[in-house]
C-alpha cells in the first residue's frame, strides 16, 4: 500500500537493534578515518550483516579515509579470504593459568585455496575450546 508505519525500536529483534546501534559508530569511523573496535561483532547479528559491516569498512570507495575495524567474533563464516586477508585474521588461545595468546593465521601459511573455516573448526589453527563429549552411561 506504500504506507509508512512507525515501529518502536524496542519491539525489533536483538539483531535489528544491534545493527542500528552499530550505524553511528560505523559511519563515524568511516567519515573520520578512525579505528572502530567491536567486541563480539556477531552477538545477535546475522552472519550476512556481520559480513556487510566488514565489507563496508574495507571498501575504499566508501572508506576513503582509511578507517580501520578491529573485531572479536565467534562467527567462523568471516574466515574468508574474499573478505579478509590472511594477515588480518588473528586467533586467541587460552594458555596455562588462563593467560591468552594472540597469533595470526599467516603463521600457518595456509594455501590460497584452503577452506579456512573448515580448517579452524577442525583445530588446524588452534583457538578452539576443549570440549569432552558428555557420557550418559553413568561413567566418568
Question: Language-model segments: which ranges?
Answer:
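Conserved ABC ATPase signature
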Residues: 1-27, 41-47
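Conserved active-site beta-strand-loop modules that form the wall/rim of enzyme catalytic pockets
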Residues: 18-19, 33-34, 68
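Short basic/glycine-enriched coil/helix segment immediately N-terminal to the Walker B
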Residues: 26-34
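Catalytic Walker B motif of ABC-type/P-loop ATPase nucleotide-binding domains
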Residues: 36-39
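C-terminal lobe/lid and adjacent interdomain/linker elements of RecA-like ASCE P-loop ATPase modules
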Residues: 51-140
Amino acid at each position: 500500500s506504500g504506507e509508512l508505519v512507525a515501529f518502536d525500536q524496542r519491539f525489533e529483534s536483538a539483531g535489528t537493534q544491534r545493527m542500528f546501534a552499530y550505524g553511528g559508530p560505523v559511519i563515524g569511523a568511516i567519515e573520520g578515518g578512525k579505528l572502530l573496535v567491536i567486541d563480539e561483532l556477531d552477538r545477535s547479528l546475522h552472519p550476512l550483516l556481520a559480513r556487510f559491516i566488514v565489507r563496508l569498512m574495507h571498501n575504499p570507495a566508501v572508506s576513503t579515509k582509511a578507517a580501520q575495524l578491529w573485531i572479536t567474533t565467534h562467527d567462523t563464516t568471516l574466515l574468508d579470504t574474499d573478505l579478509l586477508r590472511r594477515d588480518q585474521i588473528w586467533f586467541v588461545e587460552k594458555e596455562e593459568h588462563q593467560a591468552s595468546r594472540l597469533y595470526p593465521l599467516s603463521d600457518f601459511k595456509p594455501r590460497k585455496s584452503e577452506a579456512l573455516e573448515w580448517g579452524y573448526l577442525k583445530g588446524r589453527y588452534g583457538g578452539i575450546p576443549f570440549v569432552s563429549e558428555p557420557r550418559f552411561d553413568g561413567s566418568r
